[in-house]
């Protein structure tokens, strides 16, 4: 309302100013230049009395939206694909409606945004909110949490390098230990970091909580986790119980997640890297004065003082840490997502190759080949070494599944037409005859679904099946023709003389197929 009043005041000022300048002897062109408006606007103000001006400003014309007829189509697509952009909607509208009016991009964006607000369709799907509960403190010496991290640092000459680290925290006292490495953690290096931590603590806890990290787990095995050989041997030797969180659930070990974040933001930020031994020494000093020496935020206790009590409950560690031998080597990833090693090709997940400079870390251990991501240091995959030559060894899930996505699209079409037998047969024939273009044809049909009911789509597919036509564009064209035909029939009512004859309909179908190059 305030905006409307301000707008009226500005117009009223303009009306009075135009007349004031006219009385001073200025013509329409001069008034327009002075006020920055067109001379036609000046003429309109001069020809309008005060009563006419007030009446015009008081009347509110309601304009019909140019794209109003397409609101339900846009709504249906936004509800199914809430992440879709206005530009993509514009393209679909032009594709499904040949007579779609020419409008600018801003008009489309505004219309799509209006539909989103009207029906409450956000761009991001709301995620499920998790309920939290504060857990009681665990007994001394029972639990610890461990995790891995990495961060880029600057050297003295300004070069950027990445360092990797292992972090472990005792759950009760919050007493921490960190160990840095210049290479990603494999199983051997992870075991060595555990041994250093046990030596630092002077003992070990009964249980340690981890992510389901490939460095420690060989296979998930439907919940019966199978540990890597070296880590399994280490667990048996030290007699502690490893506890693994659910996949993608880092919040179940929040204490060590906070430690990793604390190391990155407090210890590593703005620190110059000299060498890894110096970095580990600096980390020990930082733990003494800050990481373990300052009061913990939630317990309001100092971890170093709490650890004096927890140390008595730890199982004594009498071993000697042994540094693992064998350095990782950097290997180039081929464009077919494989690495060549000793005359064989070992696969990586589809999409690993990102250009000619893509590399991974390679490490051979215990008859296995481990490949690590160069950027994150995470274990990408593990292969058994092949003694033959010239073989390609594929990992589970590394080969592209070509038909799974298309099958899901076909299922959506069948659900829409209530599993009509003719549509199912047409889709089956389409897949057999045009396997390479099967998905593209399905996508065309899915895009027209919001614009036509299932009866129209079923009729169009039935005609194509009868004529042996297997092309999504032909189905789309037929749907448009059938829809227009039904609209004409609804307009003329039941007048037999105005109905399209069947021979004319067949001729129209043939013209559609000919235009698509199918007859």
Curated annotation (Swiss-Prot):
Residues 135-311 form the Integrase catalytic domain. Residues 13-78 form the HTH IS21-type domain. GO terms for biological process: DNA integration; DNA recombination; transposition. One of its GO terms (molecular function) is DNA binding. InterPro entries: HTH_IS21_transposase_type, Integrase_cat-core, IstA-like_C, RNaseH-like_sf, RNaseH_sf. PROSITE patterns: HTH_IS21, INTEGRASE. Keywords: DNA recombination, DNA-binding, Transposable element, Transposition. Involved in the transposition of the insertion sequence. NCBIfam families: transpos_IS21 (NF033546). Belongs to the transposase IS21/IS408/IS1162 family. This is Transposase for insertion sequence element IS21-like. The lineage of its organism: Bacteria, Pseudomonadati, Bacteroidota, Bacteroidia, Bacteroidales.
